[in-house]
Amino acid sequence: MTSSSPARPPVAAASTPSDAKVALGWLHTAKFLTTAPELKHLPRLDVPEIAFVGRSNAGKSTCINTLTQQHRLAFASKTPGRTQSINLFSLGKQGVTDAVLADLPGYGYAAVPKEAKYRWQQVMGNYLQTRDNLKAVVLLCDPRLGLTELDEILLDVLRPRVEEGLKFLVLLTKSDKLNKTEAAKALSIVRLQAGGGDVKLFSSLKRKGVEEVAQHLWDWAHPPEKPAKKPKAEPAAEAATGDEG
């Protein structure tokens, strides 16, 4: 698959993971980068990309806006299922991009024509399977519904890449609508559905889980550098043989 390759933004050196305050300050640098109706229109990037996915009305745009502390960075259409583009947002201080957030269209809204649904299933599947710089996926889910059939299909698509090291997190949004007993039950059920994957409660209204998720995003985008391999020692020179004349 080929795609256009616009000029790449400058890339920052890897940073050391720090506390949630640093992570939130970094997320606040988010700026709109580009939008693409199809995968082939996305720019090729060398920085880590973190994708947000989920059903329509799962609170995806609100979650992104809360994490970045910006009111309208991610646009939430008044008509669920209307947004049908992948939106990228650059992250990085002093104009140096060191990661990108990807806001994928919500899925599962009944009023969307079947043709559009099928096209977006293909686009999302191709994106999740082939996007080279994709390092992590955040799946947003309404805990009152649990993971739906479409969510579980998405998990199946992701599973091979997760086994290869792709980071994955399920966020139970709107958790402020649950009491403690309901929240604990929702966590248990979704953890089983997600095959033991990482699942957390999140509430934009109560700011529950915001700092913890921000720290996850920071750590995924700034993995510790692997220690450089020591060069192999040169074989000792063999002693010269024979008499010198």
UniProtKB/Swiss-Prot annotation:
Residues the record lists as binding GTP: 54-61, 81-85, 103-106, 173-176, 202-204
GO BP: any one term: division septum assembly
Cofactor(s) required for function per UniProt: Mg(2+)
Residue ranges annotated for the EngB-type G domain, each copy included: 46-223
Compositional bias (Low complexity): 236-245
GO molecular-function term, one example from the UniProt record: GTP binding
Annotated binding of Mg(2+), by residue: 61, 83
This protein's UniProt keywords: Cell cycle, Cell division, GTP-binding, Magnesium, Metal-binding, Nucleotide-binding, Septation
InterPro entries per the UniProt record, alphabetical: G_ENGB_dom, GTP-bd, GTP-bd_ribosome_bio_YsxC, P-loop_NTPase
Positions of region (Disordered): 219-245
PROSITE patterns: G_ENGB (PS51706)
Ranges annotated as biased composition (Basic and acidic residues): 222-235
GO cellular component term, pick one: cytosol
UniProt xrefs under Pfam families: MMR_HSR1
NCBIfam families cross-referenced by the UniProt entry: GTPase_YsxC
Function, in words: Necessary for normal cell division and for the maintenance of normal septation.
Family: Belongs to the TRAFAC class TrmE-Era-EngA-EngB-Septin-like GTPase superfamily. EngB GTPase family.
Identification of the protein by name: Probable GTP-binding protein EngB
Native species: Polaromonas sp. (strain JS666 / ATCC BAA-500)
